[in-house]
Amino acid sequence: MQDDPRSGPTKPTRREFLRNTGGTAAAAVIAGYAPVSSDSAAGQGGPPTTSAEGPNIEGVVSVTLRVNGKDRQLRVDPRTTLLDCLRETLSLTGTKKGCDHGQCGACTVHVDGRRVLSCLSLALMHDGEDITTIEGLGTPAALHPMQAAFLAHDAYQCGYCTCGQIMSAVAMLKEPCGPDDAAVKELMSGNICRCGAYPNIVAAIQHVRKST
């Protein structure tokens, strides 16, 4: 007598296969979102941390930044950009974070008199160097001539890019530049104004150039 073929092991149905694999996948997803303990997270990469004061944190290094004429002794994560250090640690928020890719110029500061995109520069790179932000350029009672010219020529609209525009314009005064507007536009091309105040910006810069 032959064995009944139906009495042997049976293959799972399509419904059973989908049910089993679906449960396994769900378990994997849930495991992936499980909370991570502070001990295990400490060894993983996280957001850059900076501190002007506080305990000695592993991986944090000391740096002295001379900002607007004052030496600031800081402890920073080596990954911290100059922009984040200025804004988050020193609370100098006049330097703006725009694109954070070095394409808009809103984060422009001066380092030893030259213009630098602070979002592309690590704070650690500028140990001991002289850094100037918009806060160190002038005061409400004694504006820098470029700041006064921007006001006089209405060279801004929303104002978000203005600090970077002014910092670039001041540094540009020390750079080789032709006398015409086209030359000014070329040297200022790294600073974007989404509001389109370019004619007024150029007029303000030319006013200062002719006055000095």
Q: In which residue ranges do the predicted regions lie?
A:
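C-terminal segment of N-terminal export signals and the immediately downstream linker at the start
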Residues: 11, 32-74, 212
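N-terminal secretory signal peptides
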Residues: 1-12
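Iron-sulfur (Fe-S) cluster-binding segments and ferredoxin-like electron-carrier domains
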Residues: 106-136, 163-183, 198-212
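N-terminal export leaders
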Residues: 13-34
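Short, structural beta-strand-to-alpha-helix junction motif
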Residues: 79-85, 110, 122
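Short linear motifs in exposed loops
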Residues: 75-77, 119
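Immediate flanking context of iron-sulfur cluster ligation sites
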Residues: 84-103, 137-160, 175-194
